């Protein structure tokens, strides 16, 4: 990896030298292109660029490497595109040199995992996409912004596969006179671009260095404060597509999560003890709360004599930002292990079919992932199954759009299948046929082993599927040592404890399904355990089932399950599989009725 | 900006924290606690919540949300962590079995503290109750005075066990019932069974735990809901 990287950089340098471009040069070119056809121009460039991209792989790279990188979606920078060098600041030059030295000296990924070299050149397509993004942002049209937002990201992935994006200072000159420092919209655009810059940085490195984290935090601070300090929604002359708003909030929590998982160095700890507010849990939660409050999505229409346009919830940016903050808050609460609060927060959200969370697929998936997980940890396996089943049905029906998020969504989907597998093992329940087939394809062999009570498989699947829980305060403050406090391991061990308590229950279930009555003695003999132990296990079975169903529910509406009671020494089994005559009669009546009705109407 | 919003809020909170818990009663007190925990990240309310936890123990009332908020405050402010309070709230959670309160709390307690006293005995008891090893549970309770010192603790655990037995057994021998409920004295046991009437009935050496109504199989009965779905068909 590091070698390609190096080569990429030196190549681009050569390229730049050959062109001998300077700042003025690219400004000229831009002005030529700005005549109303940028969008088209951008697309053309995009096509061209893809073509070159492919050529490049065949010509200059080893076939194998090319294939591998193509798969990752991050090829090497195409070179046959006009580009202009960036005048790096003193600090950036140092960073770049340090980076080059490091990657030459040691091949270990250690250094690269927390640092990205600065971008050294601006490429024409990127410039065009950037201008497009800016113009559309000013036009405040959802659709156009979304298109240019997506294509800007795509062009960045092509041209800056192994380095940071150009900084906003590099890009502002491109906009020339159009950019006004004094305009609210333009200043906000700068903040948003910076957010994209850091998001890109976080996407490429495993653990960004602390300076980057601090800068990104400060940028979020600015964004939130700009929005929170507005006196009237009319002052905020911006509009953003839902996908962008979701990415913004989602990334905020993602970066918080990344930061909380850090293994801090001594100097980082020193720095943080002086700046405790940076990525602090309470602050993160507080910002989410403030946005929700400001957005008024849950408090509007109460004491209103003022015109409704004065409500912040009438402003789409505030409304959706507030809404997404609720979902992100649920995520934070789950990460901290507070599942009751998470489920309580979720009650705020209308879970109807046309609910707002369906606007953005990533949001839809995230919400249901944490909902399913919270239910699983609350031992409400049937609720977890329901939630996971719903979202997986909906994911399967959606056409697979290829954007830079689809990778991420796919990973989440796999995780949800794993969670569903666990639920199915602990509490078998009816799920959609399609989902069931997919599940068997992905985790069929695992499910069998889970049903046999194989703890290692439970651990494996849980570790794969569960979010990595974190503590609200870093160890250097709490004073606990890291291993003692590892919240993730705590969740895992409590989960496995529950699985252990459930052991044998699945076996018992499979045996008693075969009988309508059986004596305790006989069943104990079959299971080769002590009759007294069996009594305890049977009582436990009932207790756990009650746990799953919850207090309110007394009905046994699970078709796959069986009910039993003990009469002194005999077990009486009420097998639901065969005891559904009433329902099946009623359903057949309705079915036949349904197939008859259309002919009436036709007459 | 932040100051604008926070200042009046903090003043209000200060006023709230200053109210004496002992001056409030019943519903009024619950409402007060509810307003306190609405601002769940303010460590200043921890003292009040600890106080309220003692009240919950002494007066045999229960508010899970208050206790979980207190635990959360410990989680966010580890220097304030008070193991005895955690032990108390866990005991209250056990008294509320079969709800999963104990589980929810344990997700937020560092595992190292879980393995030490004063919490260890609670986690052991939790495990016995979760796996329905009631005999072991009773001997564990009897060997720790901590449990019997909490008003109504033993009664609540016994009620939980009765509940599980009721959904499991239709009839059970009276000696076995006595063992599982830790009522070895016959008169005490009979008294307890009588308190559960009319659901529980003694007949000779066995006790019937399920009322006659629930014995009837649901399979051969209609509910009106089911019937109403097909009624339109018949009307045509």
Write out the residue ranges for each language-model feature.
Chain B
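Charged, E/D/K/R/S-rich low-complexity terminal regions of large eukaryotic assembly subunits
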Residues: 1-62, 76-236
């Amino acid at each position: 990896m590091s070698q390609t990287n190096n080569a990429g950089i030196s190549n681009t340098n050569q390229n730049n030298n050959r062109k001998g471009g300077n700042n003025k040069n690219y400004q000229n070119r831009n002005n030529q292109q700005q005549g109303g056809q940028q969008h088209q121009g951008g697309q053309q460039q995009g096509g061209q660029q893809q073509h070159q991209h492919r050529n490049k792989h065949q010509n200059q790279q080893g076939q194998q490497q090319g294939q591998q990188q193509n798969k990752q979606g991050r090829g090497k920078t195409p070179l046959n595109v006009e580009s202009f060098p960036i005048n790096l600041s003193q600090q950036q030059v140092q960073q770049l040199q340090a980076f080059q030295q490091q990657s030459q000296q040691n091949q270990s990924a250690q250094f690269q995992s927390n640092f990205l070299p600065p971008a050294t050149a601006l490429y024409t397509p990127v410039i065009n996409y950037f201008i497009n993004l800016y113009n559309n942002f000013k036009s405040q049209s959802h659709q156009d912004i979304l298109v240019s937002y997506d294509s800007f990201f795509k062009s960045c992935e092509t041209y800056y596969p192994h380095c940071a994006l150009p900084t906003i200072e590099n890009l502002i000159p491109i906009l020339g006179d159009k950019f006004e420092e004094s305009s609210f919209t333009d200043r906000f655009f700068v903040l948003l671009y910076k957010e994209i810059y850091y998001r890109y940085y976080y996407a490429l490195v495993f653990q960004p260095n602390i300076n980057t984290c601090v800068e990104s935090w400060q940028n979020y601070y600015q964004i939130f404060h700009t929005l929170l300090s507005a006196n009237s929604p009319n002052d905020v002359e911006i509009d953003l597509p839902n996908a962008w708003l979701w990415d913004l909030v989602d990334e905020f929590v993602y970066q918080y999560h990344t930061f909380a998982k850090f293994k801090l160095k001594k100097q980082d700890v020193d720095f943080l003890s002086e700046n405790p507010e940076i990525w602090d849990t309470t602050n993160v939660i507080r910002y989410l709360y403030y946005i929700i409050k400001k957005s008024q999505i849950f408090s509007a229409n109460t004491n209103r004599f003022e015109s409704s346009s004065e409500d912040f919830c009438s402003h789409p940016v505030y409304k959706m930002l507030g809404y997404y903050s609720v979902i992100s808050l649920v995520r934070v609460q789950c990460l901290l292990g507070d599942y009751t609060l998470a489920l309580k927060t979720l009650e705020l959200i209308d879970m109807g079919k046309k609910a707002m969370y369906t606007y953005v697929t990533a949001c839809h998936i995230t919400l249901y992932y944490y909902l399913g997980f919270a239910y699983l940890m609350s031992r409400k396996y049937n609720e977890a199954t329901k939630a996971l089943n719903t979202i997986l049905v909906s994911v399967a029906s959606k056409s697979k759009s290829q954007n830079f998020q689809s990778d991420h969504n796919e990973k989440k989907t796999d995780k949800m299948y794993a969670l569903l597998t666990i639920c199915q093992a602990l509490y078998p329940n009816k799920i959609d046929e399609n989902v069931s087939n997919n599940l068997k394809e992905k985790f069929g062999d695992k499910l069998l082993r889970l049903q046999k009570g194989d703890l290692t498989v439970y651990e494996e699947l849980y570790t794969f599927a569960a979010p990595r829980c974190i503590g609200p305060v870093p160890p250097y403050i709490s004073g606990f040592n890291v291993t003692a406090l590892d919240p993730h391991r705590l969740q895992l061990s409590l989960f496995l404890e529950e699985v252990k308590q459930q052991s044998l229950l699945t076996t018992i279930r499979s045996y008693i399904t075969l009988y309508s009555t059986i004596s305790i003695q006989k069943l104990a003999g079959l299971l080769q355990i002590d009759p007294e132990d069996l009594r305890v296990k049977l009582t436990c079975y009932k207790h756990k089932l009650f746990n799953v169903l919850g207090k309110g529910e007394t009905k046994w509406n699970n078709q796959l399950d069986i009910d039993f009671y003990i009469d002194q020494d005999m077990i009486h089994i009420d097998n639901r599989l065969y005891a559904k005559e009433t329902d099946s009669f009623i359903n057949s009546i309705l079915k036949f009725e349904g197939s008859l009705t259309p002919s009436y109407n036709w007459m | 900006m932040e100051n604008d919003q926070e200042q009046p809020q903090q003043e209000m909170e200060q006023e709230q924290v200053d109210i004496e818990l002992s001056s409030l009663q019943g519903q009024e007190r619950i409402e007060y606690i509810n307003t306190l925990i609405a601002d769940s990240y303010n460590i200043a309310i921890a003292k009040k919540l600890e106080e309220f936890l003692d009240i919950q123990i002494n007066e045999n009332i229960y508010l899970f949300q208050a206790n979980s908020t207190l635990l959360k405050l410990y989680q966010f402010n580890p220097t304030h962590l008070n193991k005895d309070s955690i032990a108390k709230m866990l005991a209250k959670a056990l008294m509320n079995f079969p709800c999963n309160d104990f589980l929810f709390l344990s997700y937020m307690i560092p595992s190292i503290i879980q393995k030490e006293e004063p919490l260890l005995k609670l986690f052991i008891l939790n495990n016995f109750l979760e796996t329905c090893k009631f005999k072991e549970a009773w001997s564990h309770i009897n060997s720790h005075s901590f449990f019997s010192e909490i008003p109504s603790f033993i009664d609540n655990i016994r009620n939980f066990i009765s509940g599980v037995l009721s959904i499991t057994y239709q009839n059970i021998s009276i000696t076995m019932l006595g063992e599982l409920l830790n009522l070895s004295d016959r008169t005490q046991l009979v008294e307890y069974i009588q308190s559960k009437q009319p659901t529980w009935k003694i007949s000779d050496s066995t006790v019937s735990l399920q009322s006659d109504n629930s014995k009837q199989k649901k399979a051969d009965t209609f509910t009106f809901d089911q019937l109403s779905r097909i009624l339109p068909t018949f009307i045509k």
